[in-house]
Amino acid sequence: MSTRYKFSGNNLFGQWFLNEPILEKFQLVSKNHGLDFKLMHMSWSHNVFQSKNAIYVSGAWDNNENVVKRLDLFFGVELKATDLLAAGNDDFFYVVDVKRLTIWIMHHEFDKTFTFYPLDLKFTLGKMEKENNDIEIVKMIVSNKSVYFLTNKGCIFTGIPPIYLDTRHCLGRVCDVACGYEHCILLTDFGHVYTWGSGKRFQLGHGDIEDIDKPQEVDALAGIKITKIAAGGYHCLALSEFGDAYTWGWNDEGQLGILDNVEHPSIENPIQYSIPKLIDIYDENGEIVTIDIVDIACGSKHSALKLADNTVWTSGYNKYGQLGLSSKMFPSVKYFRKVYESCINFKIMCGIWCTVIETTSN
């Protein structure tokens, strides 16, 4: 199985193995040092990827740039890189063994090596479930302030040491979780969406700016089965089973991609939307596009959609070319524009200041 990536956006630290500091159109990322890699994590200054049974970091690391370095984590413990998850923020970098429930942590400024901790999730889950065997971590994400773990039992833990986040009031089992800078969003297998955290930029979708300390359902989506969620810096996207996408939160750079006035697209849209709003996509002639949306992704201040015809549409902040457009011609885009199309299937992902297209072949 071979994975290939096309990338547009910030490469200021050489994290994408390319010479140009900014890529304003999607360009194929070639193998570096002969490594066939699988991307694990994107930050604004470095990437983490798996190659065979090892984990590497590329970009800015240990006060250097254009680094490609194998991470030495394991202190003689034999592990499979396929059993590991990696993520980080400006302060800490985390690597988790999803099966052994252990974590390695490094502080970017003060640490030169990783510190090992056990994650005692089974003890906590044992208080709630009779059967707590075969627990695995299926996703790890980080916000500016914390780290979150989602297990195959649908439980969320936060912090080090991990504390159980009570989601027993949620309708269905938690199947996904995402974080912005100061807020979080989760999805259940019943298609219900819940948010919590800071609401000061309307990113929670509850119609106000109140902060919430535990997951609360987004009422405007309660009658719609949602199949995927994404979180930007201060905004969210949600994809429905019918191929519609909804968005809400901060819109200072057009990251919500909403065009309220089709006849006069130059008119500024509101800087925020406090509840989810249906996204309409328009072609270059101003005609509405009726093709289903099949994938969504969020960066810090931009968003990306994939349609069923294998096209990618982006909107929002474009200082680093993360929309796949010229940053001089389009410093920001206020509504979704088509920027890429392909005859083969692919996935879309967004880093903080980049957009990535991933294809997999045998």
Feature-to-residue mapping (PLM):
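Eukaryote-biased RCC1-like beta-propeller repeat architecture
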Residues: 1-362
